[in-house]
């Protein structure tokens, strides 16, 4: 979509702009975890581009190849966004907890739900139709809940980057665009 292209354009643009303080995405994430009192989350690397994520079950914040060693404004923004998820987890942010509980339902519901509903209709078996619809509704709920969780992580990232003077005022303008794209 047009919005996705625009988001990726911002990330690409700010991936070419290096931070004045020459801090890598990994260094930014480590520092932000530390100043937020989060000592039980490990940092790891994951192959790919924009494959960054926080795994609450493993307590690992994984940064992609394009973020890990990069000193770009985009890398710092993406790393801070993922750190925002670690902060959400540490503070027991309910929408994140609820979303994580929906992951198994969303995985099953998005793939099996529609098929069960169709099969239930075809076989005149209403309970199967209802189960399919409920499973699919669970996957829809997951995606609806994901948006506020992502926006909250980006808002947390913006605030902690500002509070800790990791980026200059000019760089913060760019990182805000990256964080909107990350959400």
Feature-to-residue mapping (PLM):
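Polar-ligand-bearing catalytic/cofactor-coordination segments
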Residues: 4-107, 141-183
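Post-HExxH zinc-binding segment in Zn-dependent metallohydrolases
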Residues: 102-125
């Amino acid at each position: 979509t047009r919005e996705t292209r625009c988001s990726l354009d911002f990330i690409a643009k700010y991936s070419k702009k290096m931070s004045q303080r020459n801090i890598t995405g990994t260094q930014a994430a480590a520092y932000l975890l530390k100043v937020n009192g989060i000592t039980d989350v490990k940092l790891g690397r994951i192959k790919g581009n924009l494959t960054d994520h926080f795994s609450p079950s493993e307590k690992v914040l994984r940064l992609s190849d394009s973020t890990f060693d990069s000193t770009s404004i985009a890398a710092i923004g993406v790393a801070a966004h993922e750190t925002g998820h670690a902060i959400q987890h540490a503070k027991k942010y309910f929408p994140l907890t609820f979303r994580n509980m929906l992951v198994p339902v969303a995985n099953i519901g998005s793939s099996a739900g529609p098929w069960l509903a169709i099969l239930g209709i075809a076989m005149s078996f209403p309970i199967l139709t209802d189960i399919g619809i409920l499973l699919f509704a669970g996957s829809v709920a997951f995606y609806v809940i994901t948006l506020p969780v992502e926006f909250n992580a980006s808002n947390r990232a913006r605030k902690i980057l500002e509070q800790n003077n990791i980026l200059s005022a000019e760089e913060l303008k760019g990182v805000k665009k990256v964080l909107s794209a990350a959400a």
